[in-house]
């Protein structure tokens, strides 16, 4: 996970001070950086503290992920739902975010420069060798960005779904905050 030391990973040593603020979606304290006393480092978790972000920049981490996927495919599973898949690639310079000016933090947390490289590699190394189905959860992705995940010629994922469509019945989320466009049927 993000405490791996090899390649300028997604962690910060205590001596470097607290990393730039990042909001955690599920952490009650709100901060996506969690201090780990034994390593004297912070690790990143955009969701629960028990879900450290993996460092997809590290090829050894990706190889381990592919081994795990192959293990389950060899056991006979028919496919995978890839939760919050846009978050696997991020800007690891972690620029300061003016939350008043940019309340939508999604672009800072996800859709990083190598996202589609990682997905194509995962397809090439694992999914293309099995008769399986892949479904990515792509909340807040635009239709144009969403197509990049599933376009057949890109060889990444089979399907992508968006919670915005699933939550259309919820009047408090009736409009897409990313685009300001009202939903209608």
Regions found by a protein language model. Name each.
Residues 1-11:
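Single conserved hydrophobic/aromatic residue that forms the stacking wall/gate
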Residues 36-37, 54-55, 112, 160-162, ...:
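Poly-acidic low-complexity segments
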Residues 38-40, 84, 100-111, 170-180:
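Active-site-proximal cap/lid insertion segments
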Residues 56-144:
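Active-site neighborhood of glycoside hydrolase catalytic domains
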Residues 5, 26-50, 138-160:
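Short N-terminal secondary-structure initiator segments
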Residues 9-22, 119, 123-185:
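Conserved alpha/beta catalytic core and glycan-binding cleft of carbohydrate-active enzymes
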